[in-house]
A protein has these predicted regions:
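Conserved SAM-binding motif I beta-strand of class I
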Residues: 75-80
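Conserved SAM/SAH-binding beta-strand->alpha-helix loop
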Residues: 82-84
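A short glycine-rich, Lys/Arg-flanked "PGG" loop and its adjoining helix->strand segment in the class I
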Residues: 136-148
């Protein structure tokens, strides 16, 4: 059985497309927030106005699209293993006429340096529910793709707070 499928599902089908996972904009992942946190810890973060941001497992881009809309001088890249989610996100990007954002479908285990380097890398939520090889790869991508003064945001959803969004 392919790692992205469940019993009874074909290898070409993707469980992340089969079960809808709604996306949201998360203010605490915004480059403005990440830059301020970095400053508070004595770091010298990259300027937000011209930053390059990667979101790992971006779903349909609901977190990245508002950032791209409000920071036109920055560049945004997101990928997700679910092609249908990425396609929905691309429809929103096209409708808004955004030119500073790119979404694509990819397995995290198969991406790397070809993406370039980033000032900010976001891996929100996924770390809590993906298998160990994917968690390891998420951290490795931060090491490979983060610029020297870059900031990585890796969150871990834990009970009981992680179920608040279901209320």
């Amino acid at each position: 059985m392919a790692p992205d499928t469940h019993p009874g599902q074909s290898a070409s089908a993707n469980v992340y497309d089969a079960v809808e996972y709604p996306g949201f904009a998360y203010a605490h992942t915004h480059p403005d927030q990440l830059a301020v946190m970095a400053l508070l810890y004595g770091l010298d973060p990259p300027p937000v106005e011209t930053c390059r941001v990667l979101e790992v497992a971006c779903n349909e881009g609901a977190n990245l699209i508002p950032m791209a809309y409000t920071i036109p001088g920055a560049k945004f890249v997101g990928f997700d293993i679910a092609p249908e989610c990425v396609a929905r996100g691309q429809e929103h990007i096209n409708a808004l006429g955004l030119k500073n954002i790119r979404l694509f479908a990819a397995d995290m285990l198969n991406v790397g340096p070809e993406l370039g380097q980033f000032d900010y890398i976001i891996a929100h939520g996924l770390y809590a529910w993906v298998p160990e090889p994917v968690r390891d790869r998420a951290l490795a991508l931060c090491g490979e793709l983060l610029k020297p003064n870059g900031v990585a945001f890796v969150s871990y959803n834990a009970l009981p707070g992680s179920h608040l969004r279901q209320m």
